[in-house]
Regions:
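Primary recognition of N-terminal secretory signal peptides and signal-anchoring hydrophobic helices
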Residues: 2-6, 12-148
Length: 148
């Protein structure tokens, strides 16, 4: 009986391990953009490359704030840009410096990693909303973001 329970636990753990740290590298406008130690990691989940929201927004010089009660991330860019997203929602809102608004519906849901206290979002959706072309090289596991 103990053996059966042990096997069942191992199988449950194996099935639930769908999130893992990736060896993926990110280049933004030709420069490597690494996530600082203690600031999260690049994560592969549901066939998408997720990054901590704070990492990417701060790379673009945004001031980032977290609203715990609503579980929302707010970003204010250096030229008045606005970024808003909520954990558990597939909707992302972005307003650029010219006041053009974009509401993007993602095909996967951003998630909160409680152990790291980090909110993760698919890099493609946030980058495209902010006017970047997104490239993927599967052979080198490299994401490239290039400003349009």
């Amino acid at each position: 009986m103990k053996r059966l329970i042990s096997i069942a636990l191992v199988l449950c753990m194996a099935v639930s391990m769908t999130v893992f740290a990736a060896n993926t590298e990110i280049f933004i406008n030709g420069e490597k953009a690494g996530i600082a130690e203690g600031m999260g990691a690049i994560v592969e989940k549901q066939g998408r490359t997720f990054v901590p929201v704070r990492f990417l927004l701060e790379h673009f010089k945004f001031q980032v704030s977290w609203q715990e009660k609503e579980q929302m991330v707010f970003g204010m860019g250096p030229e008045g840009e606005i970024f808003v997203m909520q954990v558990g929602s597939e909707l992302l809102f972005y307003k650029d410096a010219q006041n053009n608004e974009k509401k993007v519906t993602m095909d996967v849901t951003p998630f909160l990693n409680m152990s790291e206290d980090r909110t993760y979002i698919p890099i493609r959706f946030i980058a495209e909303a902010m006017g970047y072309d997104v490239g993927w090289d599967g052979a080198t596991e490299t994401v490239t973001l290039t400003k349009k």
